[in-house]
Amino acid sequence: MMNSDQKAVKFLANFYINGGKHWTHGHLRQTQPEPTQPKASVLLLGPEPGMAWDETQPPKMKEIPVGLRLQTGTPQESLPTYTQTLRELLLEQRPLITADLEVPSPTRYQVPSPSVRESSPHPHYSIGCKHQGREGGGRRAWQTLWFQSESPFTQKADFDQEQKWPSPAHYQLLSRPAFPAFSFRGCHSASKTPEGHTHLGLPGARGLGLRVQPQSLLQASLQAPGKRCPGPNTYNILPGSRLQSPRSPAFSMSRSPAFTSWLSTSFSFGSPNPWPSRLPRGGLQLTLPFGAWRGHPGCTQTQAPRHRPLLHALEPAGHNLLGPATEWNHGLPRGFPRPPLGLGAPAWPSDPLGTPMHPSGWPTLLWAVDKAGPAWIPHLPISPLH
């Protein structure tokens, strides 16, 4: 097989032998140069050998292109000098060039000047339009849209010249129209904190007017007046860990699993229920805590307190439960039975340190116990157990 150089030599040799014409089809014949005229006709004759001129049919005049026209005249005046057929003449004719010569071909383009961060240049455009992307790539891809190069054969990262990573100081924040100031809600200013959110969530600080200076206020005071964008460490997380209301509700309509399980374990200390038949059906069944019983659960000496009537109240943690009944009984709903006044017993049994024992912090509920059994049993219209 011949290589490209041998094929080129053979092509030029055939072009020189054929008189400066390319071979297209069939055998090339040596013909004389034919002058061209504005308009002429050629006589196409095909007589058989030995036949006279008069015996032949009348000649047919056919119009041919300008480049292949002969001299004008009658058949007697101008003898035929071109003996090729019409098919051979059309095969040698070249089609006109319809392409625009001013437009560069796909394989012809101007090589751009090589960039500092690239080791090989690439064309400005390939098939489509040039992508107007931001400068970036490699270690400088802070604000670039595409990390890949425009050409699939080159890469933007040149680690031989980029020896240092950019610092966070090179990063520029986007303009205000580039990102929304809020998402589904209004923009919450970090420098404004509601008064109800500044109270400490501690029992001793309730009602004393103590306020907390959150970290967001300190960070907001250090910022410049023109900048309003808070940093990631300037958000106030204290309001989410406290009650949003200044005081707890008097009663709750929800069913807490912890409260339901606490009520369902009524008198489950290992001793029999002293009054199982006196509790009304659908009433409120409460459980006496461990501090209200003498001895240990399961022992023979374990018995209910019989020294005096005991009043138990379930109030939220942090309230003073040692006052008279008229002071802490204001949270009862309308129609709830009231205990007799003058009972100075602690509202809830306390541990040795004096801290009220309260398991869940639920609404105010009363329970009275005397020597003969429950003096009165609160009966709500709608039982929380049903």
Curated annotation (Swiss-Prot):
Transmembrane segments: none annotated. Residues 107-118 have a biased composition (Polar residues). GO terms for cellular component: cytoskeleton. Residues 105-136 are annotated as: Disordered. Disulfide bonds: none annotated. This is Protein STPG3. The lineage of its organism: Eukaryota, Metazoa, Chordata, Craniata, Vertebrata.
